[in-house]
Amino acid sequence: MTDTIMELAVDKFLFRFPSDLYYSESGIWVRFEGATARIGLSDYAQQRNGDVAFAEPKEVGARVRMGEEVAVVETIKVNLSIPSPVGGRVVEINGDLLRSPELVNQDPYGRGWLAALEIENDAAARLGLKTAAEYLALAKAQAEAEVLR
């Protein structure tokens, strides 16, 4: 992971976004590792949705298309169907989340990752994803709108 972290402060909250990752509009981060994409909830998404009580990625070997459910995450606020930001085959899941789902909140970009997928189409995988700066701007607009409610 890079040492460059972009930060966004809104009201009493501080959100962090590593600049070496890509982000979907739904708040899922992607780390490209060769032909594999590791994914998880962004710091903004995990803080916004509350403490994670349960996290279950699809099984290894499952094929998912971009936008299809790749994991289910239950928080104290809401049950989330996590859409895959890339299409591919699940090659690894974070088994630690079965025992310690709070890792999603404690270390969203490290030990709290959800799944790794073997990418089916590398060129298409990056389409529609945002850089950290682009996602920070989107998160800022969403967070400020929520504070005003």
PLM ranges: what are they?
Residues 2-66, 111-121, 129-133, 137-149:
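Acidic, low-complexity mobile loops and tails
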Residues 32-35, 93-99, 124:
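Short, conserved beta-turn/loop elements at beta-strand boundaries and strand-helix junctions
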Residues 43-45, 77, 86, 125:
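Short glycine-rich, polar/acidic loop-and-turn segments at beta strand-coil junctions
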Residues 53-54, 60, 78-81, 105:
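Short, conserved secondary-structure segments in the cores of folded domains
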Residues 59-73, 84, 89-92:
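Short, well-structured beta-strand-loop connectors
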Residues 69-71, 76-78, 96-97, 121:
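Short, charged beta-turn/beta-strand-edge "cap" motif at the junction between a beta-strand
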Residues 80-111:
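Mid-chain, well-packed structural core segment of small domains
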